[in-house]
Design a protein with these regions (language model features):
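A short, Lys/Arg-enriched amphipathic alpha-helix followed by its capping loop at the start of a domain
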Residues: 13-21, 61-66, 106
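Acidic, His- and aromatic-enriched active-site or binding-groove loops in soluble protein domains
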Residues: 92-93, 168-177
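Metal-dependent polysaccharide deacetylase catalytic core of the NodB/CE4 family, i.e.
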Residues: 1-2, 40-43, 63-157, 181-189
Length: 194
């Protein structure tokens, strides 16, 4: 367990609690497909980085109630380990193509987190464009269109948001808090479950 990983039991309790109180968890794609009045009882559930543990742990928990989520993946890391993450204390695998296809077929949205999980604030304009455009093209061709993006490390500014807006309708940051679609759609906040 680390500061961005939710323990399995905590996640299970959260999902059970939401269900018992008439709330549902869903992907951003599913949420946007609903009439606005129906959205009040739904929460968009997101996972960054696309670790394989989602397949073995989160999928069964959410599937129990027919819930789904959006998982943000880096396209060059699909099926590989997390050597890129020197802050992670253990070696973890990213979801592979078969696992991502299963999630997609179960109603999960597969969305972009860039190509390599680079800090966008440190990239040149050409590198930034590549990360945003290439990941969009790959995700859309493999799993169908996605309008969502999550900034690696939450790293963004007005210029990065403008670049992302050329390809996506919504972008998630790592800022804590609730949000609405009438807010800044390229700086959507989220709550961590802990």
């Amino acid at each position: 367990y680390d500061s961005i990983t939710t323990p399995i039991d905590v996640f299970r309790q959260f999902v059970d609690f939401m269900y018992k109180h008439g709330m549902g968890l869903c992907s951003m794609r599913y949420y946007l497909s609903m009439p606005p009045k129906e959205r009040q009882s739904w929460i968009v559930c997101t996972f960054d980085d696309g670790y394989a543990g989602l397949y073995s742990h989160a999928l069964p928990i959410l599937s129990k109630y027919g819930f789904s989520a959006t998982v943000f993946v880096c396209t060059s890391l699909i099926g590989y380990d997390n050597k890129w993450n020197n802050k992670d204390s253990k070696m973890r695998m990213h979801l592979n193509m078969d696992e991502l296809s299963t999630l997609n077929n179960q109603g999960w949205e597969i969305a972009s987190h860039g190509v390599h999980h680079y800090n966008f604030l440190k990239l040149t304009d050409i590198e930034l464009e590549y990360e945003i455009q290439q990941s969009k093209e790959q995700i859309d061709s493999l799993f169908g269109p996605s309008d969502c993006f999550a900034y690696p490390y939450g790293a963004n500014n007005a210029y990065i948001q403008q670049c992302v807006s050329s390809y996506y309708r919504y972008a998630f940051a790592v800022n804590q808090g609730g949000t609405s679609l009438s807010a800044d759609t390229y700086q959507l906040r989220r709550y961590s479950i802990s």
